[in-house]
């Protein structure tokens, strides 16, 4: 809700995104760095973890995170992952049918996903980048991932809508890799009842 105060009601959503994120003086252009610096005592490590996890839609296991970030697989990494989960930047889950040993960490913060996909490392983008690319295949694919993340961030509301708010559940995804004989299949959200 705080960021909505920056929106100009006479502009379209894409125009507002351009004005806030892609304009040279955009109010949210540097928000990613400010956000991590204001929330965490070691913002660079936390950004490294989030950026690592954000590289793959299904996320990574902790040993992979340690390997990619150079942060030792120890209590220090555990504390950082717990802080990111508690802050709702990432979730921890075991893919459907896998053991807890295969626990993964997945990026679910929409702002971080947007920043990593469209801002980080990209310089000299036109100030109307979002307006010009709204119908591109890349943005359409990103919207699908963003919708999945909205669902993951609102499990309690989904459960309420399904009439199972009081039932203990686990959330996960399921992927069947394709091979020479079968196509691959993916289910983005499975809500498994524990009753």
Residue ranges, per PLM feature:
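A cross-kingdom feature that marks ATP-driven nucleic-acid transaction machinery
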Residues: 96, 103, 108-195
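A short, conserved structural fragment
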Residues: 85-96
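Amphipathic alpha-helical "lid/sensor" segments that cap RecA-like P-loop NTPase cores
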Residues: 1-34
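Short amphipathic alpha-helical interface segments
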Residues: 41-58
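Short acidic, hydrophobic short linear motifs in intrinsically disordered regions
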Residues: 56-68
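Short amphipathic alpha-helical interaction segments
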Residues: 70-87
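Short amphipathic alpha-helical boundary/capping segments
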Residues: 32-42, 64
């Amino acid at each position: 809700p705080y960021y909505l105060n920056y929106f100009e009601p006479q502009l379209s959503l894409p125009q507002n995104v351009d004005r806030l994120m892609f304009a040279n003086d955009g109010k949210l252009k540097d928000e990613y760095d400010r956000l991590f610096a204001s929330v965490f005592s070691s913002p660079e490590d936390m950004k490294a973890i989030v950026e690592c996890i954000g590289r793959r839609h299904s996320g990574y296991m902790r040993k992979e995170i340690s390997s990619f970030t150079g942060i030792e697989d120890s209590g220090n990494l555990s504390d950082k992952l717990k802080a990111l989960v508690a802050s709702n930047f990432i979730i921890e889950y075991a893919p459907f049918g896998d053991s807890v040993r295969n626990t993964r960490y997945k990026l679910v913060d929409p702002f971080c996903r947007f920043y990593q996909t469209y801002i980080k490392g990209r310089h000299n983008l036109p100030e109307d980048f979002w307006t010009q690319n709204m119908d591109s295949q890349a943005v359409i694919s990103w919207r699908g991932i963003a919708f999945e993340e909205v669902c993951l961030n609102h499990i309690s509301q989904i459960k309420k809508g399904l009439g199972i708010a009081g039932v203990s559940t686990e959330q996960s995804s399921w992927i069947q890799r394709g091979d020479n004989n079968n196509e691959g299949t993916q289910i983005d959200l499975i809500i498994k009842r524990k009753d």
